[in-house]
């Protein structure tokens, strides 16, 4: 990070460019996965396949994270993110070609989503560290909130826009994703490399040990370990958003446009909260606020499971997404603030696996439970499970629960990296 002494309290121009690139990347990613989910469900009618779709994206992230974190620490993160964006654009273009051929098999779609997951594995640690690299210490929390705003704006625009584009042609949303990724890449290339000291290039066993440093650092920090594992377990239970294609079709009776608006409702709720946090950041009772937000997320999931009305489902999605935005804001502030600069890529890569696991394995869990107990049973099980997790973490992670202010978690300047 840039020293606060050199800051005027304003977000640097280069950070604003990076946040704009994040918006276009999120627009493409979330819009595309929404349409992929609809097409897979239309072709198979299986909630389980919706879960397996998430697994196809997550497995590359889990397998490659021991390498992508050190790569983000060793090389120019801007270039790493740029190559990843180009790979994502390639995967989207191949999806465009395949869907345009009016396919009857979903297996190639799963393969292309796995390819997309490989690109995401490289993009995640680099893209999440870049805005922090360019941010003065005194604006880091604001930048975290603004990054959430950019991401959630993409979540709003992407599914709604891609839903309308889908009506014009089933393959056209993937072409829109290609264009969005290329715009993000062009923006990224206008930002020069940061002055962060890079990890020395090593090979063999030392490289593997470097990859494990992020995991060891998190495990030794009860605050980070508690916050990240809370997100993993809670969202693992509360992965109902992955079932939106089935909810839209079977519970609410709406088509692609309605599904797009439901998915956009997630972004609307999260954006309202993220914008509020960018103007009025949390200043006290950080730990208790995190646990309370996860509890509200669980309650919103339960309401979604019980709803047969589009408006009520839309509101429930806004509420649970807003609560999730608080959780993401707190965790996304804690992790970079508590991590030495030269370890940030490795730590964020490990956190990325937890995030991916919570979202994608949550999709698998929801798909499996929906196949076994029905759509409503799966969603209610997830909501109740999330509330149970909050009770357990409140009891067994007092260090996290009792965090009052973000400044408490900053590492000593003498701490080795």
Regions found by a protein language model. Name each.
Residues 2-60, 216-266:
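Helix-loop boundary and gating motifs at the non-cytosolic
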């Amino acid at each position: 990070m840039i020293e606060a002494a050199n800051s005027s309290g304003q977000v640097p121009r280069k950070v604003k460019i990076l946040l704009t690139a994040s918006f276009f990347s999120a627009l493409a990613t979330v819009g595309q996965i929404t349409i992929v989910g609809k097409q897979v469900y239309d072709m198979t009618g299986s909630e389980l396949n919706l879960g397996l779709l998430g697994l196809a994206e997550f497995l590359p992230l889990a397998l490659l994270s021991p390498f992508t974190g050190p790569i983000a620490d060793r090389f120019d993160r801007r270039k790493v993110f740029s190559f990843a964006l180009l790979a994502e654009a390639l995967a989207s273009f191949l999806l465009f070609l395949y869907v345009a051929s009016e396919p009857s098999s979903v297996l190639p779609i799963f393969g292309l989503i796995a390819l997309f997951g490989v690109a995401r594995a490289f993009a995640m640690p680099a893209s999440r560290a870049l805005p922090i690299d360019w941010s003065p210490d005194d604006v880091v929390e604001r930048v975290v909130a603004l990054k959430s705003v950019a991401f959630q704006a993409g979540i709003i625009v992407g599914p709604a826009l891609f839903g309308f584009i889908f009506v014009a042609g089933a393959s056209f949303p993937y072409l829109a994703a290609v264009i969005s990724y290329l715009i993000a890449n062009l923006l990224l290339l206008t930002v020069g490399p940061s002055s962060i000291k890079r990890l020395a290039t090593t090979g063999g066993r030392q490289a593997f040990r470097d990859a494990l440093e992020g995991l060891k650092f998190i495990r030794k920090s009860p605050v980070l370990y508690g916050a990240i594992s809370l997100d993993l377990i809670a969202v693992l239970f509360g992965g109902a958003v992955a079932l939106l294609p089935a909810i839209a079709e079977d519970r609410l009776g709406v088509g692609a446009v309605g599904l797009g608006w439901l998915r956009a409702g997630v972004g609307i709720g999260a954006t309202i909260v993220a914008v509020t946090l960018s103007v009025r950041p949390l200043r006290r009772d950080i730990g208790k606020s995190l646990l309370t937000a996860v509890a509200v997320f669980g309650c919103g999931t339960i309401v979604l499971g019980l709803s047969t009305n589009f408006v009520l489902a839309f509101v429930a999605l806004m509420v649970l997404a807003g609560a999730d935005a608080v959780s993401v804001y707190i965790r996304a502030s804690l992790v970079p603030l508590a991590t030495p600069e030269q370890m940030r890529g490795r730590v964020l890569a490990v956190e990325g696996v937890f995030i991916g696991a919570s979202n994608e394995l949550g999709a698998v869990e929801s798909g499996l439970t929906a196949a076994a107990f029905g759509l409503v049973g799966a969603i209610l099980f997830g909501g109740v499970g999330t509330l149970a997790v909050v009770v357990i973490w409140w009891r067994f992670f007092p260090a996290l629960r009792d965090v009052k202010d973000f400044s408490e978690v900053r590492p000593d300047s003498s701490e080795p990296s």
